[in-house]
Amino acid sequence: MMFLLRMLMRRGRGAAMDPLQVSMTGVRMGERFLQIGCNDKSLLAGLAAKVGLSGTAAVAAFNANEARLAASIARKVGALIDVKDIQEGRAWPIDDAAFDMVVVDDTAEGFVNLDQPLDVLRNAWRALRAGGRIEVVTPVKNAHPPIDFQKLLTEAGFKPVRILAESNGLRFVEGLRTDL
């Protein structure tokens, strides 16, 4: 699998893949992961390659542009990525406890434009299995007033919640779905 990651990095498809971003998520081969938002092409490509054919890769796209980008990435890297069209304020077409990991790609700070970001995170909580993890990837230096993802994740039901790391201009915030 590392061979595939290195090959994708060398080919220069889209943005240069940062293995740190992929490894910080903790996604493992064979896992079922859902990425919310599709702003960082290299993150999605790396995560899809990491879970491999024995895992499941899916993207929850808020709009047609994100859906097209995710489908394009899937074709370019030869990965099976299920693109889910989601609408804010509506139930998502995703089964309960369907995923081991949710990655929120907020590198373009799209959460600022959402009317109800807490509902998005509650849907993510519902989509995770008990013991599943969520990770939010967001810029350290925000163009907009920063969103307190630790607070939002806690309000959505994730416990514990922590800043996992800040590196290369990105902040990684992690939460766990517990059913206590």
Where are these regions (language model features)?
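Conserved alpha-helix/loop element of class I SAM-dependent methyltransferases that forms part
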Residues: 11-31, 42-46, 50
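Class I SAM-dependent methyltransferase SAM/SAH-binding core
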Residues: 34-35, 39-91
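A short SAM/SAH-binding and catalytic strip from SAM-dependent methyltransferases
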Residues: 100-115
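A short acidic, Gly/Pro-enriched loop at the edge of an enzyme's catalytic core
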Residues: 28, 89-103
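A short glycine-rich, Lys/Arg-flanked "PGG" loop and its adjoining helix->strand segment in the class I
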Residues: 48-49, 116-130
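Conserved beta-strand signature within the Rossmann-like core of class I S-adenosyl-L-methionine
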Residues: 131-139
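Core SAM-dependent methyltransferase catalytic element
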Residues: 156-180
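Conserved SAM-binding loop and adjacent beta-strand
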Residues: 3-19, 38, 144
